[in-house]
Amino acid sequence: MRRIVLTGVPPFEVQDLAGPLEVFSQCDYEIELVSPERDGSTAINRGLRVTGGTDFRKFDRPIDTLWVVGGPEAPSGSYDPAYLRWLKEMSSQARRVGASCLGTFVLAASGALEGRRAVTHWQWCDHLAERYPRVELVRSSIFVKDDHIYTSAGITTGIDLALLFVEED
């Protein structure tokens, strides 16, 4: 069974997590939430929390697909350095990686997108290009594949990308 790991920097957008989660949950996948928070919970916007996840420091299982989400704080670039190291390592080990909308910022901050093509939400393209000049920004696509790393331009295109992953499997 393929292991799908969903992760990101809180608070993330509900639909950024729920859309791909719903797609993946319809398939024969083992789905896990890995959190940058020690208790394994993750804040999502609107004051809600998702519980039942695993602290990234305790997660050491193989990952087939790593899915990275973001939210309103993602462009700030203020992330736990240990989490970013973990994310970069897992990105290099996973068969494939997906980032939806502002999750591209989180993946870029880890260094996993250096020298790669990527896309993010159109409102944030200039900010991504300025903050991460070693990422080749593609402004005209809804999603971009560079080797085993895929990025999508928005929340609903993240659902499209999740459907593409299912089709590939």
Question: For the regions a protein language model found, what residue spans apply to each?
Answer:
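Extended, subdomain-level signal for the structured scaffold at the beginning of enzyme domains
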Residues: 1-97, 105-109, 139, 167
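Small/polar loops that bind or transfer phosphate-bearing groups
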Residues: 8, 120, 153
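Short, surface-exposed amphipathic charged segments that create phosphate/polyanion-binding patches used
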Residues: 46-50, 133, 152-153
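Short active-site oxyanion
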Residues: 92-97, 112-117, 148
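Acidic/polar active-site rim loop that often engages polyanionic ligands
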Residues: 105-113, 144, 159-160
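A conserved active-site-flanking secondary-structure segment within enzyme catalytic domains
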Residues: 113-142
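Conserved anion/nucleotide-ligand pocket segment
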Residues: 141-169
